Amino acid sequence: EMCIETDNDVDDAIIVGAGKLGKALLTYGGFKDCGMNIVAAFDIDEEVCEEDYGGKRILTMDKLMDLCERMRVRIGIIAVPAENAQAICNLLIESGILAIWNFAPVHLDVPEGILVHNENLAASLALLSKQLKEKFDANT
């Protein structure tokens, strides 16, 4: 396992976007091993809200700010389409989020002091493909 050393504190995080990616992140058990706890997910689709998914709750967006403030959540995960990502980012920051793990394929404009890590799945796969081709070409 590749986890960064932590101080044994567990950092709570939330996910916005409870589609396939959001649900996969919500139920992934490996975050606990790295000192992370996903406390809830949020979505605009009321069909998926209020359900229990893998022992975690999917809540309506109107509950996001209260939960973040009450639980002092400082990490937000964005798993929404690109066209919604900036508005979600702004809401997360308004709710006290200080660090964002962004899965939307878009650059987020954030104030100074807010940490953003962009996870570009397409670029990661393209890099892996390129490395495979280089390895294959080197062996022929």
Map each language-model feature to its residues.
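Generic structural signal for beta-strand residues in well-ordered domains
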Residues: T6-N8, F31, E51, D109
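Glycine-rich adenosine-cofactor-binding loop
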Residues: D9-D45
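Alpha-helix termination/capping residues and helix-transition junctions
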Residues: D7, D33-G35, R70, E94
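Phosphate-bearing ligand-interacting subdomains
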Residues: E50-N139
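Short, small-residue-biased leader/transition segments that mark boundaries at the very start
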Residues: M2-I4
